[in-house]
Amino acid sequence: MKRGVSALVATLAFLCATGAVAVAATQIGTDGPDRLSGTVAPDQLYGEAGDDQLLGFSSNDYLEGGPGSDDVEGADGLDLVIAGTGDDDVDAGPGNDVVYAGAGADLVLGGPGADTLFGQADADRLFGGSGNDIVYASDGEDFVDAGSGKDRVYSDEGDVTIDAGPGNDWVIAIGGRVLVDGRDGNDRIRTGPFDDQVTGGFGADSLDSGGGDDTIRVKDKKRDRVECGPGRDTIYADKVDSLIGCEDVHTRGARIG
């Protein structure tokens, strides 16, 4: 079947909602720059090659950019976005969306809702927005801003900078050098065997630094717990904090285990 920008291929599914009939369709672009727009029904938009613009609408859409530097907007609904290769910009919009960044230096905005964001190769910028998000950084020097909510951030390869945002967050970043700030909330942060910089932020945090010569800051007058690993770590703490296995401690009266 020939693929063309004007082709509305595949399914004409008739959905009766609020007494109206909605038509769901699949749109497939060309190898050049395309602009594909969804409808009120669940749509599937494929940009193919070229620098494309894909616009979802008010339903649960599937948006795939393909090769090229694409601009993808999910709008309302529970959307699945595959950015594809290239330096893409993705705005998932409201709803509990899933976004795969793909190869290239991508910008991903999760927006309101409990989103799941996957970074891929190259230096991605991943913003969770509001909601309880899950963010996976990958290889490449990624930047993660989890936003507000009880977020979970994972990184098992590559260097990463993480702003966990307000909320009681979990951060596990063990695959490269890490710069992480827990911000407000009672956070749990674990890093790996590299020379990391960790700031707990305002809240009763639990930090496990792993190996490496780490710098850890938990001076916020809250009761934090820090467990240092192999390597020589530098800790800035309060007297109410509990420090385990830490070498170079800068505080007065902290309990050192």
Language-model-detected regions and their locations in the chain:
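Disulfide-bonded cysteine-rich modules in secreted/extracellular proteins
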Residues: 27-29, 257
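Bacterial N-terminal signal peptides
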Residues: 9-18
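Glycine-centered beta-turn/loop sites at beta-strand termini
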Residues: 29-32, 38, 47, 56, ...
